[in-house]
C-alpha cells in the first residue's frame, strides 16, 4: 500500500476547474465548511438564519469551500434536512454572491434525478461561478425517498452508474450514445459546457460500486470519518487503485463534525462522526489527517455549542494559519 508522498515527490492533481484546483493540492490539506453554518442539534431542520452572510464571511476568512447537501425530503429516521433549499437553486445564489470560495455539493443523489437535469444544472452552476463547482455524487442512503419517486431502492447502484456515465458524456460536443436514461444523438447538444471541459465528479463512499470502478472513473473520493490509522490505510489503498488504473493521482476528502471548545488546550473527545475539542487538538488532528493522505476536510458545526460567528473567527485565527504554514514548508 502506498505511503503518503512527501511534498517533493507528490505529483500534482489534474486542474479540472478553478474550485477543484484550489481545494485539492497534493500533500496539502484545505478546510471547508458544511452548509448550513449553524447549530441545530435540537432537531433536523435548521433555521438558515444569516446563511448567506456566513458563507460570505467564510470566504473572507479563507475557508476553501462550502458544501451543500442534496436532501429532497425531510426523512424522520435520517434526522437532518440539510440546508433545506434545493442544492442547484442554492448554487445559483451562491455563485452570484461569492467570488473565490469553491462551491461543493456533498453529494447529489444521482438515482433520484434524471442525469440530463443534473448535467444541465451542474454545468450552469459551474459557468455562473466561473469554474468553482465541485460535484460530489452518491447512490443515496435514505430508502424512504425511493418509493416517493416510484423508484426501486435495490436498483440504485445500476442507476448511479448509468447516470454518472450520462453526465460525463454530456460534457462532449453533440454526444451520441445509448444509455439506460436515454439516447442522445441526432445532433442535439447540451449547453453550457463545464468551464474546464468536464465536471469534477467525486464519488461518495462506495455508491454501490466496486472500488476499482471508483478508481477508474472518479475525480476524487469522499469518505466517512474514521480513526487516523484506519483512514491512512483506506487512502493508501485508494491511491494504489488509482495508480493501477493508469490514472494520475486523485484526491480524497472527508467531513468532520466539530464542537470547538473555549479552552484552546482542551483535549479531544469523540462525538457523532467527529470531535469535541480545543483549537490545539483540532490543529493536531487536521495535521494527522494530512499526513494520512487526505486533501480536504469539510467541518460541520451542527453540534457546535459556541457562538457560530465567534467559532468561525477562532477557526480562521487559531487553526487555518497552521495549515497554511505547513503548506509553505
Residue ranges and their predicted role:
Residues 1-329:
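Active-site-adjacent structural elements that line small-molecule/cofactor binding pockets in enzymes
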